[in-house]
Amino acid sequence: MEHLGAHHLHQGQAEPISFGIDQILNTSEPGSCMVSHPRLQDSADYGLGCIVGSAYNTVTGGYGASGGGAGAYGGTSCSMGALPGSYNVNMAVSMNGNALSSAGGVIRVPAHRPVAGGVHQPLSAAVPPVNGMNSLTGLTFPWMESNRRYTKDRFTGHPYQNRTPPKKKKPRTSFTRLQICELEKRFHRQKYLASAERAALAKALKMTDAQVKTWFQNRRTKWRRQTAEEREAERQQANRILMQLQQEAFQKTINQPIQADPICVHNSSLFALQNLQPWSDDSTKITSVTTVASACE
């Protein structure tokens, strides 16, 4: 029993916890944040501390119970110090016992911001300029650098204005009638020229070697096309003539009179086989065959 009583007495005399939520929210020092937890103390060595008067300072006269009362968000702010290998970002956390703490440790947040006197103050007039805000404009991140690296200059104006102009075509070389006549004569005699012959012809006609070579290449292409067209026309003409001759020969065989074979004249069956022919409207031939057969009998 004495041991149990001593144990209860020891528990009753235990010191209160110094890092509870109530102690943190109800701190009496307006410009400091309590860091009593061992892990929080260790994190302070890495640059996590509370800095008063950082870049993000809340405006006095903010959320309050009455319009003319003191601001609920004070000037106390906690910021993250510079960590090695981390971004330089300031995070402001405003604290006030009247606004953030209540009975039972429940945080109450007003539904709207009451304005004193019913007059809306402009944001620029309510927020004083802070030197720390100017330092935030110089923040750079790795993704910003990559975007700047791959950005392309955009040109203003019509979309077709900045296109590369098309290449100018070379003017077509024009030859004189005398040059063309001499080239045609030489082409009819010789379709291909050697390098020495081409140089001599170019010198005689006062032309360059490249001009003579190009002219002969174009002329050979034209000659091949004309030759192919002429051959095709000749082939079609020959086919038409052949079909016409076949039709005429067929008509002659049909209209040619049948000569009676002297051997078959006296035999009616052989004579009938000899005179087999397609059906025709000519009744005179049929009558002649019947008369000849009757005569043979």
Curated annotation (Swiss-Prot):
Single annotated GO MF: DNA-binding transcription factor activity, RNA polymerase II-specific
Region feature Disordered, mapped onto this chain: 153-174
Entries under CDD domains matching the protein: homeodomain
GO cellular component: nucleus
Chain's role: Seems to be involved in the development of cranial sensory innervation from peripheral ganglia.
Gene3D superfamilies reported for this sequence: Homeodomain-like
PANTHER family linked to this entry: IP01054P, T-CELL LEUKEMIA HOMEOBOX PROTEIN 1
UniProt main location, coarse: nucleus
Organism this protein belongs to: Gallus gallus (Chicken)
Keyword check for Nucleus: yes
DNA-binding region, residues: 168-227
InterPro entries in alphabetical order: HD, HD_metazoa, Homeobox_CS, Homeodomain-like_sf, TLX1/2/3
One Pfam family it belongs to: Homeodomain
Subcellular localization(s) per the UniProt record: Nucleus
The name this protein goes by in its record: T-cell leukemia homeobox protein 1
Keyword Nucleus in annotation: yes
